[in-house]
Amino acid sequence: MKLWELALAIGGAICLLLGTAWIRRSELPRKDFVLDAGICRVPVTEYDPPASVSPAGSAIVLHGLSANRRVMTYLSEDFAGHGLRTYALDLPGHGDNREPFTFPRAQLCATATVETLIRSGTIDPRTTVLVGHSMGAAIAIRMADREPVLATIAISPAPMKLPMRMPANLLVFTAQFDIPPLAKEAKNLEAAAGGARNAPEDFAQLRAFDLERIPFASHTSLLLDRRVAHRSELWAMRALFPDVATETLALNVDLATYETFNFGRRRLAGAVLGLIGLVLVFPLAASAVVQLFAQIFRTAKNQASSAPAADLQNDPQINSSNRMPGRALILVEGIVSALIGVVVLILFVPLKFLHLYSGDYLASLLLIYGALMLILNRSAARATFSLNIATKVAAAALSVGTILAVGAWLNWQLTDGWLNAPRWLRFCALVPVLWVFAYAEEVVLGPVDSGWRRLIRFVFALALRLELWLVCVFAYYELMSGQVLILLLVTALAVFSILQRLGTDALRRRTGSAPAAAFFGAILGAWLIASVFPLT
């Protein structure tokens, strides 16, 4: 344990406490339940306005592909904080919904849920707003043919067959960095609606339309964008109160009780601050876990404390005959291996039995890529391999603790980080697959150095990941792979890759074991794929 690790851990604990306080201060009444809607069982979270605020209407929030109702927490609580009782749904195959996902089934269950809420008198379609993102936005728009409501807000809608009639009071958002098919869909909706109409009489006659282009935003960042939340709430208020001046409604949205007195804007900041706190605590946790299991195994084997110490401090030395090729050659090997992988996946997907929408494709690609990279660098792979049990157990304990801690925090405010039973089964199947990929990465990256060499190694690791993603982009546009979800998740995959590499390097530096570091990275990667991609 080092002084800087202790200092970071103290800072992390402060971040966690402060983040928790901010979230608690701004929390609204909420309850979770499962709604029986015909043949669908849909998990729902209901967010109520502050106790002193009488609901002006209702909002139904629909998430996008590979998301869940917790991803929509920021928008859901913001709508509730401004006087709309809000219902966020988990569509089939997403979040807590264990039913298999297909696009038609997602639309069927979303529509059935709205119909059930209307029939039960829970919501009134004359004061209800549909809010959707990506796939959820497309479903909300197409719902106009079955369940017309007061207004619809479509955030970066997915490509769709347009409904027979346009939804009433439709607001569409598109991001500056949206992928071309999504940007094109927004323009198609604008053309179908006949351009912008946002006068008070347009809202009164249920024909208002506007297209908002958000600069410096991506497909996923729109969900956490204050501009999107503010303009969405103002649009909903204009639909609910068309006779009230827009300036008055805007002032009401800006100075709403929830924002002014309950620090609603700190909600998201608190969630992010908590994640930063967990990152700061990690170095101390890694050192403590490695030292603990090293001591346990020394005691169990009745050995001198210095005997296994070398295995916990230094990577095995690779002699000149087994030396790795240069980084430029490794990048070429990576591109070739990834291209071979996407070509093979045109013929068949080896891990199709996992039944994870796009997740089985990604896992299969990583398996093929990892196997080819190990074959190309087999001498270094043999020289790097070790069977020290203490390091593997330490890696397993640290990785499981990490996904439980991070998953619990994410599950509270940001996304569904807890795995249900079907996802745990897929997680177990993914770990050995991801170990092949992770070990190939550790082999080609080599031992963790210090100073500038460590930074260069880190950038090189991210370059290898970027290569893989760019090959997936190539496969989507040129080979018609259909795996658009991997493109849409670029932000999440980038953030995960950075944090996973930092954690894996920290463990490898403390254990000196490439296989143990790969085991740690594999467990984190398996958790990501099992938790994010929809069940089919």
Outline where the language-model segments fall:
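N-terminal membrane topogenic signal
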Residues: 1-7, 325-332
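An N-terminal hydrophobic leader/cap segment in hydrolases
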Residues: 2-36, 43
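Alpha-helical transmembrane segments
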Residues: 4-11, 269-279, 427-428, 490, ...
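Alpha-helical transmembrane segments of multi-pass membrane proteins
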Residues: 17-21, 283-287, 342-345
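Soluble extramembrane regions of membrane proteins in the secretory/endomembrane system
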Residues: 27-262
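Intrinsically disordered, low-complexity terminal tails and inter-domain linkers enriched
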Residues: 52, 300-324, 524-530
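Cytosolic-side membrane-insertion boundary helix
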Residues: 246-304, 318-330
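Alpha-helical transmembrane segments of integral membrane proteins
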Residues: 310, 314, 328-536
